[in-house]
């Protein structure tokens, strides 16, 4: 049995949710209603996020990138955590509902690109279009956009020990099939509503300490 870690990006690896930061900075007020409908599950993630990015003109590309480079912060302990999982031969994947145009630059030099799964964006028209290269498989009907539970099934074996790290509604379906969940913020609320066991965290030092104990037990 091997340990596999599946980690969210926005609000998990980074301190802030970058999509929400983009919307607050660049989108019109109407985006707030769409965001609330996503969180209340009135809109699927795929439908809601597609609508959000249709508010953003493509000519803001460079300005958005610069804004995120200046404002996005990597969560405390992440660099050391990556060294830890590599040293212990633990498989690590970023499974992010975020967008390629900011996920790849912010993780450059930290995570190999082949271990990152995120959505793709098209800047060829007036407004940003989101493409969805990792859709739900036949086990999931939630219109996730990037389907984290489907990616877990694709990337792992049933006898692997699955760890999910996340912070929001977008991580709920993955949390449902994890052997261990590390949660913060809104994902804690959703785990409690769905009776999913979880360990709260604020830094990756917290997660690393828990994983050390887990490795000792597994050994």
Curated annotation (Swiss-Prot):
One of its GO terms (biological process) is L-methionine salvage from methylthioadenosine. It catalyses: 2-hydroxy-5-methylsulfanyl-3-oxopent-1-enyl phosphate + H2O = 1,2-dihydroxy-5-(methylsulfanyl)pent-1-en-3-one + phosphate. The keyword Hydrolase applies. The gene is mtnX. Belongs to the HAD-like hydrolase superfamily. MtnX family. Pfam families: HAD. Disulfide bonds: none annotated. This is 2-hydroxy-3-keto-5-methylthiopentenyl-1-phosphate phosphatase. Dephosphorylates 2-hydroxy-3-keto-5-methylthiopentenyl-1-phosphate (HK-MTPenyl-1-P) yielding 1,2-dihydroxy-3-keto-5-methylthiopentene (DHK-MTPene). CDD domains: HAD_Pase. The keyword Amino-acid biosynthesis applies. It comes from Bacillus cereus (strain ATCC 10987 / NRS 248). The lineage of its organism: Bacteria, Bacillati, Bacillota, Bacilli, Bacillales.
């Amino acid at each position: 049995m091997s340990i596999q870690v599946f980690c969210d990006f926005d609000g998990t690896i980074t301190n802030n949710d970058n999509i929400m930061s983009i919307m607050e900075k660049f989108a019109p007020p109407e985006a707030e209603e769409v965001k609330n409908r996503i969180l209340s599950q009135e809109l699927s993630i795929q439908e809601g996020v597609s609508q959000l990015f249709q508010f953003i003109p493509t000519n803001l590309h460079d300005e958005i990138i610069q804004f995120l480079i200046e404002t996005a912060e990597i969560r405390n302990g992440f660099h050391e955590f990556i060294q830890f999982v590599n040293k212990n031969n633990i498989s690590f994947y970023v499974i992010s509902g975020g967008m390629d145009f900011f996920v790849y630059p912010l993780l450059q030099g930290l995570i190999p690109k082949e271990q990152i799964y995120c959505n793709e964006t098209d800047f060829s028209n007036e407004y940003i279009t989101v493409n969805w290269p990792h859709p739900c498989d036949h086990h999931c009907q939630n219109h996730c956009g990037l389907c984290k539970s489907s990616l877990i099934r694709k990337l792992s074996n049933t006898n692997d020990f699955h760890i999910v790290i996340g912070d929001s509604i977008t991580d709920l379906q993955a949390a449902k099939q994890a052997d261990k969940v590390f949660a913060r913020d809104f994902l804690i609320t959703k785990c409690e509503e769905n009776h999913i066991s979880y360990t709260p965290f604020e830094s990756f030092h917290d997660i690393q300490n828990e994983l050390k104990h887990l490795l000792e037990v597994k050994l």
